[in-house]
Amino acid sequence: AASDVYKRQIDVVVPDVTYLSQNKEKIKGIFITHGHEDHVGGVSYLWPELGCPTIYGTPFSLAIARHKIEESGLPVKNMKEVNAGDVVNVDCFKVEFIKVCHSIAEASALSITTPVGVVFVTGDFKIDFTPIDNKLTDLERIGEIGKKGVLLMLGESTNVERNGHTMSERTVGESFDVIFGNCLLYTSDAADDLIGV
């Protein structure tokens, strides 16, 4: 579990990509479902090992990936922005980005049409009927894909091991309003050019 990793004070865990590295000519792209650290944090390690294939993701996810790559001193190249509903054709594969709710902007599921069937990758998601950006998980599109038939579903969801449901991000914002609504904020700075808060 991730908590065990933190207890050992390990800052970064990078998976063994030997097989991928030995077969990099077969890799046609890296597809990012969202911008959380556990999904893009290793891109600066993985990407050059695989010969810098095209990275596909939403604008926000790619901005985070771009920062990771720049931070490691590598030149940024081969990035393609996509939006929910877009389909990317890569060789014999079609990859559709589908809007899902998560605790970060522009999260996506992926529907990958292959010659032998559809692989559905949920990415991290939650069903949130009141998301702060008012963009709901595209349950209609997910249902359409399901009706056509899915060969394999790769599902993940933060806190899946807990009973019940996860509260809406909107609830978190409302809680902050209650907690901090009557607080007095005071800041000071000795700098002469302080404009103000």
Protein language model features and the residues they cover:
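Positively charged, low-complexity/disordered segments
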Residues: 1-2, 189-192, 196-197
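His/Asp/Glu-rich metal-coordinating catalytic cores
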Residues: 3-31, 36-188
